[in-house]
Swiss-Prot record:
It is found in: Cytoplasm; Nucleus. Zn(2+) 3 binds at C77, H79, C96, D99. Belongs to the RING-box family. Zn(2+) 2 binds at C55, C58, C70, H84. This is RING-box protein 1. The RING-type zinc finger domain is essential for ubiquitin ligase activity. It coordinates an additional third zinc ion. The gene is rbx-1.
Amino acid sequence: MAQASDSTAMEVEEATNQTVKKRFEVKKWSAVALWAWDIQVDNCAICRNHIMDLCIECQANQAAGLKDECTVAWGNCNHAFHFHCISRWLKTRQVCPLDNREWEFQKYGH
């Protein structure tokens, strides 16, 4: 069996000694990839900022360097909010701002 580099242009020799023309030859390949967060929530419903951006409280205190502390809090209802936003909300009401179910933390952090 001949190697592809030994074959003449557009021909390959198979094990049965038959000559078969290639359908096509890849000259150059540029791969493209796409990724996205696996979440259904894009924005915090309280401050309306993107959920992966800083909340309004952290934006106001950006000079203090607290941006690593701006995390996402998920409820058992699968709604997500900035932790600072939902913490302020929970001081007055113990329910989810979107569906009025009793708020319980499902997970906390990015």
